[in-house]
């Protein structure tokens, strides 16, 4: 994995959950496991529409194009499988209604766009999705909005969750890092930080300078920890398998610590590691049989997969992992989002 040059709040939070997850993220050989999901697609749509509030082209045109682009990427990531249509994405209808209302509240203001690629901020606020880099520390980030209200400096992060309330500890940490970046750039510590929902509600807190400094310090420690592991090796002791950390991790099929630690009562999609004993194609679908290696409660049981998306038909003796399928041991059928991963020969 590549060392971290500038850590972002997202990477810091991920390291706090599991350092191995970030190592997978920064390993180019694992790129095929990183794919968009309906949830991330909808989140991207919401952020894009919020940036364009008041655009002269109108809500419907902006919304429809954002959805079409997100769905195209989703299809590209999962081809030849066909992901669910946008109308069936969780939260799609409610997000659309809330954004339409936000659009109406915004009037006909100029489009909320600023190139995120520019690291040098403009002379005046507001800043919208502008990348900020700390001049002395290995930290960078892109706050959604930095603005001044009644002479008070605010840092805002837009959240697309349907039940957002006060910032969670992770959201608070993210905002505090952004505050540190704004302070380093402007020379002024923000007074307030807040998460903002698609309804326009803001859940704020007063920014404490000491808390900001502590958060920046934790980010530097995380960079040092990760880069030390990148230089010396990512041992399994650096992984932190747990239900919350692993539930949405795209690398479960490649992660030995997860497969060794996973418990039967973890509320996580089925994942299995198996050694192939036979493989064939019937009615244009792969039918692959194997013997389970992990998880522990299925060891040595037979596993038959039907229609799984193997890049090439597996060979007898190979070891494969699969996740997000329909069924379980002893037999399972592929879903649109089933992922397979061939383990290297031991």
Describe each region flagged by the PLM.
Residues 121-216:
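Mg2+/Mn2+-dependent nuclease catalytic core
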Residues 291-316:
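Beta-strand/loop nucleic-acid-binding surfaces
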Residues 49-128:
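A non-catalytic, helix-rich entry segment at domain boundaries
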Residues 9-58, 251:
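Nuclease catalytic cores
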Residues 263-290:
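Structural detector for short beta-strands of small beta-barrel domains
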Residues 213-248:
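Polybasic (Lys/Arg-rich)
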